[in-house]
């Protein structure tokens, strides 16, 4: 199809209508309603057929060309939409809004909804345990305004961020499925490397119009009440988001009631690398198994799980909030009160998203049935909440209201097990509306009328093979075999000829058809009108209902954390004002669940006298586990949770950094070592004396001297910054750091060898490791025994011939390269001698190349 569709005169009327709508949405797939199917045309059809693995065919011709087409049944659209959304596609839903019986030309069609990955609300298209976020960003390299919206809950927030680095870290945290940026931004910016980036017109971000639309949405004169009146960039981004949401939903958004101003200074910041390394809610393979959330999430509701995920990804530095959560968990543990609450919370379900769909006016009948059941369960839950003494739990109880009138209305209106959609009726109870009952009675009694009519006609005509039936195309009919058609009475009017049969209509049957079909269509229309009125009633109660949902989600998280504290042997950490991090018998919460043997717990102590631990020991000895468990304990403490330790005393931290493991960034053109150095640079630039830093094997991706020098200098820098640092290394030379840096101490993970086999003991002990056990680990990994034997020979020779291991402490501030055993010092090569004698200044390029080839042959 030609890309130029501005001249539609050569197209058929149907295709003219299609292109008028399609030209408004050139970059989105259009589902075009044709009877019982959504049909997809032209380039959209080719793309959809490939993505959905459905047949590509053709639908006649228009403008002299065949029309590529594929289609799906309208009643099965959800599954196909879910697949497209997961693939990052956006879909325009175009429905028939006119009456085919009265339409002249093509039936009128309109775009009723645009489904994009960030604005879907249908239950079938969403992951119930994860937020589905869309974000918009505005600004320059110095300052950015970021707005974030979850249309499935109504959560709407803004913040302003300094610099690309912090912006990208925040985007990594929230992980939006769509990101809106101004169309006048240059191409190739860092944010565009993310999935789902969509460019919007610059005027969509204009501050004054954004401010006006936000005030209209929230029915306020200004945004001062939300604390964001002066956030010019963030307001522009929020205005763009609101406009996009309205454009895609094609309806009012009453469930968007407020704007929350978030501040990075209130949180513990984790960059993208740290978030990935700690495997908070996604493991390194992209799954959810063996993540922190997989261990600490036993929430009874999906909305509780989503809130817990937010907490894990946004630890707080607000001591008042953290201590309120701790007190709540303690209260819920007292007398095992959480055990009474959790079954009741399970009855509540995911009312947060149900209420959002009600606000969007696309709630399904089963949504209302679930809301009915939740409202019925509220009084008993509220009664249980009143028995809780903790101040914060009392506040949640006060926010949780009961709604007896709404509960009674829904109980009266919705049948016990309603169908999935309102379209075919059968949702509202008999007795809810007298007029609907009358219409349904007339329609439903049609079957008995047809049975009686068939019996009467058989008796009247004497034709035993006579049948009375109905189909959607031709309506009601009397059918006779072709051989008996000539015996039909005179009042039988021929309606349809089939192979082997004739169909007729009689005046009596025609009169009934008019009444029955009219009654059915009027009943469906009446039921849809009553259902919409029910939604409007619920929408008028949205604000308190949403507040209740928010309170119950938090109660679910706190009850869950109490249950986890009991069953995982977690204890309450204590925040103190003096700088310290003291953990007794700390454990890795994920690893200990996977092990079939008891986990070896370890202590940690950092304070003003010791700010860095240099950790040595064998591979697989537990260094990385020890470091990660420290970070996870600190993180859990900063969401208000109890922690996997016998005791924990710590001061608030501002950031958690990890430099653990690396892989190539092939798409970005960065090697493993480059990735490692980028992460190290980020830490050295941004760590403070309140940061927790984990550094594992820094410098291993380059030559020995380069790597050692970089690791040494990085460790010195962190010691001078006074950051809480765990520095794991195989460079034994670094164990002399405490001699020049008084805030540094050595610890090691112990192991022992028995019959040339290594046994890892996993205990963290003071002082440096005595040896590395590298060959024993290689043997354990299955390296061939011949290779191990040969390696032992090389090791013995190198240990004998190398220079003694000796490093002189260097005064701070003086440039130095740490000295190390030069394992090749006793192995001179004649090529090196010849190379040193060459006079490169007097050598022509050709001669240099010839010499290079000659030297190469001698290596």
From Swiss-Prot:
GO terms for cellular component: cytosol. It holds the Pfam family MutS_IV. PROSITE patterns: DNA_MISMATCH_REPAIR_2. ATP binds at residues 617-624. One of its GO terms (biological process) is mismatch repair. This protein is involved in the repair of mismatches in DNA. It is possible that it carries out the mismatch recognition step. This protein has a weak ATPase activity. Belongs to the DNA mismatch repair MutS family. NCBIfam families: mutS1, PRK05399.1. This is DNA mismatch repair protein MutS. It comes from Pseudomonas fluorescens (strain ATCC BAA-477 / NRRL B-23932 / Pf-5). The gene is mutS.
């Amino acid at each position: 199809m030609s890309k130029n569709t501005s001249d539609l005169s050569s197209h058929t009327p149907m295709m003219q209508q299609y292109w008028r709508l399609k030209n408004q949405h050139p970059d989105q797939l259009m589902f075009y309603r044709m009877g019982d199917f959504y049909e997809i045309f032209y380039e959209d059809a080719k793309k959809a057929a490939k993505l959905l693995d459905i047949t590509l065919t053709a639908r006649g011709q228009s403008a002299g060309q065949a029309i590529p087409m594929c289609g799906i049944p309208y009643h099965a659209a959800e599954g196909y939409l879910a697949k497209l959304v997961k693939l990052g596609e956006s879909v325009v839903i175009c429905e028939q809004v006119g009456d085919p019986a009265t339409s002249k030309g093509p039936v009128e069609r309109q775009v009723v909804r645009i489904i994009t990955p960030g604005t879907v609300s249908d239950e079938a298209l969403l992951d119930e345990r994860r937020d589905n976020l869309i974000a918009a960003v505005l600004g320059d390299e110095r300052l950015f305004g970021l707005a974030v919206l979850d249309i499935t809950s109504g959560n709407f927030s803004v913040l302003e961020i300094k610099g690309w680095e912090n912006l990208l870290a925040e985007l990594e945290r929230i992980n939006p499925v769509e990101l809106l940026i101004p169309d006048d931004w240059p191409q190739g910016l860092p944010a565009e490397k993310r999935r789902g980036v969509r460019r919007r017109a610059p005027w969509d971000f204009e501050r004054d119009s954004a401010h006006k639309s936000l005030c209209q949405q929230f029915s306020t004169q200004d945004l001062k009440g939300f604390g964001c009146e002066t956030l010019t960039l963030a307001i522009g981004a929020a205005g763009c988001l609101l406009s996009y949401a309205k454009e895609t939903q094609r309806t009012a958004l009453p469930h968007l009631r407020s704007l929350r101003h978030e501040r990075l200074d209130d949180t513990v910041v984790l960059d993208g690398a740290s978030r990935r390394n700690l495997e908070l809610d996604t493991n390194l393979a992209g799954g959810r198994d063996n993540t922190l959330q997989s261990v600490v999430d036993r929430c009874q509701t999906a909305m509780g799980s989503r809130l817990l995920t937010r907490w894990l990804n946004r630890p707080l530095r607000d001591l008042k909030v953290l201590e309120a959560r701790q007190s709540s968990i303690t209260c819920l543990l007292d007398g095992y009160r959480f055990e009474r609450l959790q079954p009741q919370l399970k009855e509540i379900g995911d009312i947060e998203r149900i209420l959002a769909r009600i606000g969007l006016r696309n709630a399904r009948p089963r949504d209302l049935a679930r809301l009915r059941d939740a409202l019925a369960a509220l009084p008993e839950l509220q009664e249980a909440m009143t028995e809780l003494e903790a101040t914060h739990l009392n506040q949640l109880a006060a926010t949780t209201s009961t709604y007896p009138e709404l509960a009674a209305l829904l109980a009266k209106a919705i049948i016990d097990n309603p169908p999935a959609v309102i379209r075919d009726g059968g949702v509202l109870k008999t007795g809810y509306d007298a007029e609907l009952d009358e219409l349904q009675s007339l329609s439903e009694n049609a079957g008995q009328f047809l049975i009686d009519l068939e019996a009467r006609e058989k008796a009247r005509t004497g034709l035993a093979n006579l049948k009375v039936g109905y189909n959607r195309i031709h309506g009601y009919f009397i059918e006779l075999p072709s051989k008996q058609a000539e015996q039909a009475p005179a009042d039988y009017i021929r309606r349809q000829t089939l192979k082997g049969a004739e169909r007729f209509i009689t005046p009596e049957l025609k009169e009934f058809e008019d009444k029955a079909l009219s009654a059915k269509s009027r009943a469906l229309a009446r039921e849809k009108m009553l259902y919409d009125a029910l939604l409007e009633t619920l929408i008028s109660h949205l604000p308190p209902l949403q507040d209740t949902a928010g309170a119950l989600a938090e109660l679910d998280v706190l009850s869950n954390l109490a249950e986890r504290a009991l069953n995982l042997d977690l204890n309450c950490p204590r925040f103190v004002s003096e700088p310290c991090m003291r953990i007794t018998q700390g454990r890795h919460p994920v690893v200990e669940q996977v092990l079939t043997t008891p986990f070896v717990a370890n202590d940690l102590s950092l304070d003003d006298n010791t700010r860095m631990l240099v950790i040595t020991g064998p591979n697989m000895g537990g260094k990385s586990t020890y470091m990660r468990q420290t970070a996870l304990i600190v993180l859990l403490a900063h969401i208000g949770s109890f922690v996997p330790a016998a005791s924990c005393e710590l001061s608030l931290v501002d950031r958690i950094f990890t430099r653990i493991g690396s892989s190539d960034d092939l798409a970005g053109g960065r090697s493993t070592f480059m990735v490692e150095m980028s992460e190290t640079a980020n830490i050295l630039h941004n760590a403070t004396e309140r940061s927790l830093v984990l550094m594992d094997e820094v410098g291993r991706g380059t030559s020995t001297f380069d790597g050692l020098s970089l690791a040494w200098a990085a460790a010195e820098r962190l010691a001078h910054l006074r950051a809480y640092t765990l520095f794991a290394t195989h460079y034994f030379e670094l164990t002399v750091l405490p001699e020049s840096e008084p805030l540094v101490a050595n610890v090691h993970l112990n192991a022992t060898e028995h019959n040339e086999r290594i046994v890892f003991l996993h205990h963290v002990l003071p002082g440096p490791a005595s040896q590395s056990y590298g060959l024993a680990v290689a043997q354990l990994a299955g390296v061939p025994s011949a290779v191990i034997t040969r390696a032992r020979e090389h090791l013995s020779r190198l240990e004998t011939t190398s220079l003694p291991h000796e490093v002189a402490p260097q005064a701070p501030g003086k440039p130095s390269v740490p000295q190390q055993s030069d394992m090749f010092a006793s192995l001179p090569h004649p090529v090196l001698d010849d190379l040193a004698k060459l006079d490169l200044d007097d050598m022509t390029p050709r001669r240099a190349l010839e010499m290079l080839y000659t030297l190469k042959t001698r290596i």
